Amino acid sequence: MLVNFSKMHGLGNDFLVLDNVTQNVFLSPEQITKFANRNFGVGFDQLLVVEPPYDPDLDFHYRIYNADGSEVGQCGNGARCFAKFVRMKGLCNKHKIKVSTSTGKMNLHIERDGNISVTMPVPQFEPKKIPFTAQKTEGTYILRSESETVLCGAVSMGNPHCVVTVDSVAEADVESLGKELSVHERFPEDANVGFMEIVSPNYIKLRVYERGAAETLACGSGACAAVVIGYMQKKLAKQVTVELPGGKLRIFWQGPGHPVKMSGPATHVFDGQISI
């Protein structure tokens, strides 16, 4: 069976996108891992699947799978690519698109300049909602890894995030420490780990180790998490430019109880077919 797909990326965070509205495709975790391989497959950070909506008030259901085959509840960069894909493929002609994920709902808006803004979920700080093991909600937690003890913030953006403030992202041990913290026992579902360098209240540099993957060139939900944690720690303003290895995102947050707005580009690379 031949399956049509698109290869896309958001600031270098790359995706294989499947239309499951006009196709009927199921990929096992083993198949996803096979196709994610950059030497023997297509190569991608995550698989995005477009499905018909489960709610008549929504336009689509949005599913996300990591390169290891595990399903996750959120991907901000993927959401921008999702919006561009459904417009490009004629699945939707709206500028404002409403979708559900396994953990909530999102609004996607295609802007006049071609960028796409995503209304992300309201950040969740309560430990059991992240999930994170702690007796109470705090702005900063102490995490002890095998190599060192770090101070971090914890939040859910529809997926769990750990944010560590560093003096320099260039010198941060993203690969080793990021992997340790990602699978730390206090994150029962693992976590994405962001290393944040604060340049000014309106500008940060960020590198992210994604759970189930590794360091990526960009992470939209990670950018949102970093800004939210920085704001709650009274280090950042409401509107922040986030510089990632793959490019820049604009993040805006009004504070607790409000959703986070993220704006940035989405790029179509090529279309292809895979045999399953």
Swiss-Prot record:
- Tell me which residues are marked as the site Important for dimerization: F270
List residue numbers at the site (Could be important to modulate the pK values of the two catalytic cysteine residues): H161, E210
* Places the protein is found: Cytoplasm
Task: Provide the GO MF annotations for this entry.
Answer: diaminopimelate epimerase activity
Which GO terms fall under biological process for this protein?
A: lysine biosynthetic process via diaminopimelate
| Alphabetical UniProt keywords | Amino-acid biosynthesis, Cytoplasm, Isomerase, Lysine biosynthesis
Enzyme Commission number(s) from the entry: 5.1.1.7
Q: Does the keyword Translocase apply?
A: no
* Catalytic reactions on record: (2S,6S)-2,6-diaminopimelate = meso-2,6-diaminopimelate
Give the matching Pfam families.
DAP_epimerase
Cysteines joined through disulfide linkages: none
Residues binding substrate are: N13, Q46, N66, G76, N77, N159, N192, E210, R211, G220, S221
Pathway(s) of this molecule: Amino-acid biosynthesis; L-lysine biosynthesis via DAP pathway; DL-2,6-diaminopimelate from LL-2,6-diaminopimelate: step 1/1
Which family does the record claim for this protein? Answer: Belongs to the diaminopimelate epimerase family.
Q: How does it assemble?
A: Homodimer.
**Biological role stated in the UniProt entry:** Catalyzes the stereoinversion of LL-2,6-diaminopimelate (L,L-DAP) to meso-diaminopimelate (meso-DAP), a precursor of L-lysine and an essential component of the bacterial peptidoglycan.
- What is the name of the protein in this document? Diaminopimelate epimerase
